[in-house]
UniProtKB/Swiss-Prot annotation:
Coiled-coil stretches noted in the UniProt entry, renumbered to this chain: none
Lipid group attachment sites (S-diacylglycerol cysteine): 23
Compartments (UniProt record): Cell membrane
Annotated keywords: Cell membrane, Lipoprotein, Membrane, Palmitate, Signal
Source organism: Escherichia coli (strain K12)
Protein name: Putative lipoprotein RzoQ
Keyword Cytoplasm: no
UniProt keyword Signal present: yes
Membrane topology, as annotated: Lipid-anchor
Name of encoding gene: rzoQ
């Protein structure tokens, strides 16, 4: 019975994860020596920093809505497993 309840949420969780990963900017393939972690950076002051523009296919409200849905589904899964 519990497995059936959990399986109901699985497709929705997978879809949300796929959409969320499409919102994350993809890193270009670079040699290991040239990755951003190996290159020291001087960060600007917060007042000088420019905010990156969100990708066209994913607005800020899109990720907020998905985060709310994932949080709700996680609560349901937690409640379903804690009841048994």
């Amino acid at each position: 019975m519990r497995n059936r309840n959990l399986l109901k949420f699985l497709p929705g969780l997978l879809i949300c994860l796929i959409v969320l990963t499409s919102c994350v900017p993809k890193q270009k393939n670079m040699p290991y020596a040239l990755t951003q972690r190996s290159i020291p950076q001087i960060l600007p002051l917060p007042s000088e920093a420019k905010q990156p523009k969100p990708p066209k296919e994913c607005s800020p409200t899109c990720s907020e809505i998905l985060q709310q849905k994932l949080s709700f589904m996680l609560k349901l899964l937690t409640n379903a497993t804690s009841q048994e």
